Structure formats: structure tokens, C-alpha cells
From Swiss-Prot:
Residues 1-12 have a biased composition (Basic residues). This is Dynein regulatory complex subunit 4. Residues 115-258 are annotated as: Microtubule-binding. Residues 357-478 are annotated as: Interaction with SMO. The keyword Coiled coil applies.
Amino acid sequence: MAPKKKGKKGKAKGTPIVDGLAPEDMSKEQVEEHVSRIREELDREREERNYFQLERDKIHTFWEITRRQLEEKKAELRNKDREMEEAEERHQVEIKVYKQKVKHLLYEHQNNLTEMKAEGTVVMKLAQKEHRIQESVLRKDMRALKVELKEQELASEVVVKNLRLKHTEEITRMRNDFERQVREIEAKYDKKMKMLRDELDLRRKTELHEVEERKNGQIHTLMQRHEEAFTDIKNYYNDITLNNLALINSLKEQMEDMRKKEDHLEREMAEVSGQNKRLADPLQKAREEMSEMQKQLANYERDKQILLCTKARLKVREKELKDLQWEHEVLEQRFTKVQQERDELYRKFTAAIQEVQQKTGFKNLVLERKLQALSAAVEKKEVQFNEVLAASNLDPAALTLVSRKLEDVLESKNSTIKDLQYELAQVCKAHNDLLRTYEAKLLAFGIPLDNVGFKPLETAVIGQTLGQGPAGLVGTPT
């Protein structure tokens, strides 16, 4: 159509020249050849026009498909948002359920502590009552021994008065032997009493040292684990954030380059369309330009596809970044809550340890005072016994009788010490049974023992196996 317009303008201005000749100077064959050549060019132009129309239809179809896919992806994104909201609601419901469970656990734990305190008070009252009874029995025994010693003194005085003149040498020899035996017995029982006192002191110090070591080790391990977990989480999310930011920046730069290329190609397409409308150059130049435009069009399609893929990847990365940021905030909240729970449990654990240490120290102090009182009583009895023997100069039969009574008194004191050790074993057993009940309650509510944050302290007496059997089965320590 453009050449025809130029032909009309040529007629108005002057006679056109074809192949260097005017139309009136051309022969019929030349005119027919020129007409056939023009028709061939017209056919080729029509074919090229049809080809470009087909390409335009393909591009439009591809654009429609891409638009539908975009709408589908938007619908999927909306569905995902709804699913995320539903998941968040479910998560809030689960959090409420877990909070309710924790409240129930705290309530039961408080009830157990109250029961323990009540049981401890009852046990302490019973122990005090038994101690009073034992004290009264010991006092009665002491009065009986005093009466017997008084009677023996009177009898010994009569015997000594009757035998003093006849057996002076024999009494002197017996006195020397008896003094030697008394010194041996005194040394033996002093050694036993010192060993017993040292052993009890060593047990008490060792037990307190072990309790402090276990407590410090547990606290140090717990704090180190929390610090390592927090450092790992912080480094992990910092790396993810930096990588995502770098990737987003690179994708934005790629999008900017693609957008520039697209604008450049659109301008070139506009220029090419204008050139196609103003076709006046030779056919060879048009073919070369057409091949160049086909290459540019292919590059444009490829760049456009890359741009679409890049946009899709950018959206995915942005969504992943938002999800990671949301997860990071949730984890930070959970970590803060766990830290608060850890601090609360640590405070309760420290208070419980201090209370146990105070009770143990009080019991050890009471036992030490009782042991000191018994030791003083034994020493006093031995002094009185030595004075009686030194004043009475008994015969071997009377000496044997007095020694037997002294052994009976010592056996009674040892029995009292064993009873006190048995009471201590019962208290340790009750404490360990309470720990077992606490662990069973935690497992019943689905809380792992590792999540408690500390290891419960089991009480035991050094050298004895206590708190290991069923409840109530506590043997007398040996």
C-alpha cells in the first residue's frame, strides 16, 4: 500500500522512472516483466504480513494463558493465607490447652508439697514423742543402776571389812590387774567412740559436698545448654536472613535488567513496525532487517520467559522470607517463655535444695547433740564406775557382774543409735518416694523428664542403700 501512495504522488510531480527508463520508453516485454516482479514482491509482502499476524496471535494467546495462570496463583495464595490463619487459630488453641495442663500440674504439685509438709510435721511429732519415751526409759535405767550401785557399794564395804586383814596381798594384785583391764576397756571404748564420731562427721560432710557438686553441675549444664541453643538459633536465622536479602537484591537487579531489555525491545519493535510501514528500501535490505528482527524477537521471547520465571522466584523468595520471619518471631517468643520457665524452676529448685539442706542440717545437729549427750553420759558412768572400783576393791565375781551390766548399758546405747539411723532412713525413703510420685505425674501428663531443666536430688546415707525399694520397706542400717 505504501508504494502505491508514492506512485500517485509521483504522477502529480512527474513521470516515474523504472529500471532507468520511462514507462513510455519501455517495451511490452519489459513492462510485463516489471509487473510480474511487482506482483511477486506483493505476494511476498502478503505472506510476511500473514506470518506476522500469526506471530501476533500466538503472543496474544500466550499472554492470555499467562494471565489465567497468574489468577490461579493468586487464588492459591489466598487459599494458603486462609490455611495459615486456620493453622494460627489451631496453634492458639493448643497453646491454651497446654497452659491449662501446666496449671493443673502446678496445682497438683502444690497439693503434693502441702501433703509432704503435713506428713513431715506428723513424722517429726511422732519422732519427738518416741524420743521422750526413750529418754524416760533411759532415766529409769540410770536410777536403777544408781540403786544397784549403792547396794553393791554397801555389800562391798561389808565384804572388804571382813576380808581386808586376810587378803591384803591378793587384793593388791587384783587391784593392779583390774586397773589394767579398766584402762584397756576405757581405751577401747574411747577409740570406738572417736571412730564413730569421725565416721558420722565424714558422712555428713561428704553428703553435703555431693549435694552441692550435683547442684552446681546441673545449674552449669542447664545454663550452658540454653546459651548454646540460643546462639545456634540466632546464627541460623541471621544466616537465613542475610542469604535471603542477598538473593532478593540480586533478583531485583535481574528484574531491573529484564525490564530495561523489555523496554528496549519494545522500542525496537515500534521502530521496526514503522520501518515496515515505510518500506522503500531494496528487497535484500528488507530481508536482512527481517532476519535481524526475528533474532531480536527470539531474544525478546527468551528474555520475557526469563523475566516471568524471575518474578515467580522473587515471589516465592519473598513468601519464604515472610514465613521465616514469622517463625523467627514465634521461636523468639517461645525461647523467652522457656527462659522464664527455666528461671522459675531454677528458683524453686534452689529453694527446695536450701530447705532440704536446712532440714538435713537440723537433723544432723539433733543427732550430734544426742550423740554428745550419750557420750557424756557414758564417760560419766565410766568415771563413776572407776571411782567405785577404786574405792571398793571388788572380787573377780563382782567385777564380772559389773562388767556385764556395763556391756548391757553400752548395747542399749548402740540400740538407740541404730533406732535414730532407722528414723533417718525412713525420712530419706519418704523423700525418694515423693520424687518417684512427682516423676510419674509428669509422665502421666506427657511431659518428658528431660524438659524439666534439672535432676531431682535423691537423699541417701553414705554406706547404706536407702530409698531404693518399695515404699515403706526400709531396713535397719548396719
